[in-house]
Curated annotation (Swiss-Prot):
Protein name: Ditrans,polycis-undecaprenyl-diphosphate synthase ((2E,6E)-farnesyl-diphosphate specific)
Protein encoded by which gene: uppS
Enzyme class: transferase
Cofactor(s) needed by this chain: Mg(2+)
Ligand binding (Mg(2+)): D18, E205
Organism: Haemophilus influenzae (strain ATCC 51907 / DSM 11121 / KW20 / Rd)
Length: 239
């Protein structure tokens, strides 16, 4: 492990968890085998983020475009999601972690929506780490739904056009009052954003790992944080 500067830990880390299917294929297994092992990698990432003092960890679990996958895989993913909620929520609560599901959950089954609501209610006052799971999420969707919320408030005269600024717009995003993303990690060697947190990553540092998500461990997470700490963030300014 690389020794980290504890005064320069990113407040908000976001991860595009990519490579579950390829990992399973390498082992001649079904894709769901990769997704199942991906849950273990999530558990490790959450533990490490909490350990080093990250305030917010946002994980891209299921995009709004993922519905185009085979029906069998979608069904398996939904079952896995429910199982993970059942198994992990009490552990998250015990570790003082606040769980939030960001995305359009209305497309999920009523059973899954109820599990999400219970999990969020149980952990809402926890303060050690906020864990955002992006499910049926897309960055374009997020910006549009925020704009609609604001437009509705202006229409009802609950706010004026002059009230609209970066801060108020950010408050209406799915991530609400979370700080902007400092570090965006994508696994599996792919180098694209894939419609994830488009507003929130405006000045994020990007780190692309060749490791497939089920193999992403605390050592690889440590390397990503160390890389972040070596960079000079200018936020559009000069040296």
């Amino acid at each position: 492990m690389i020794e980290l500067d504890q005064t320069n830990i990113p407040k908000h880390v976001a991860i595009i968890m990519d490579g579950n299917g390829r990992w399973a294929k390498q082992k001649n297994k079904m894709r769901i085998f990769g997704h199942t092992n991906g849950v273990t990698a999530v558990r490790k990432a959450v533990a490490y983020a909490r350990q080093i003092g990250v305030e917010v960890l946002t994980l891209y679990a299921f995009s709004s475009e993922n519905w185009s996958r085979p029906e069998q895989e979608i069904s398996a993913l939904m079952s896995l999601f429910m199982q993970a909620l059942d198994r992990e929520v009490k552990k998250l609560h015990k570790n003082n972690i606040c769980l939030k599901i960001i995305g359009d959950v209305s497309r999920f089954s009523e059973t899954l929506q109820e599990k999400i609501k219970k999990a969020e209610n149980l952990t809402e006052k926890n303060t050690a780490l906020t864990l955002n799971i992006a499910a049926n999420y897309g960055g374009c969707w997020d910006i549009i739904q925020a704009a609609k919320q604001i437009a509705e408030k202006v229409k009802k005269e609950e706010m004026s056009v002059s009230d609209i600024n970066n801060s108020t717009f950010q408050h209406h995003l799915a991530t609400q009052n979370a700080p902007p993303v400092d570090l965006l990690i994508r696994t599996s060697g792919e180098q694209r954003i894939s419609n994830f947190l488009l507003w929130q990553i405006a000045y994020a540092e990007l780190y692309f790992s060749d490791v497939l998500w089920p193999d992403f461990n605390q050592l690889e997470f440590n390397r990503a944080i160390a890389s972040y700490q070596q960079r000079h963030r200018r936020f559009g300014g000069t040296e």
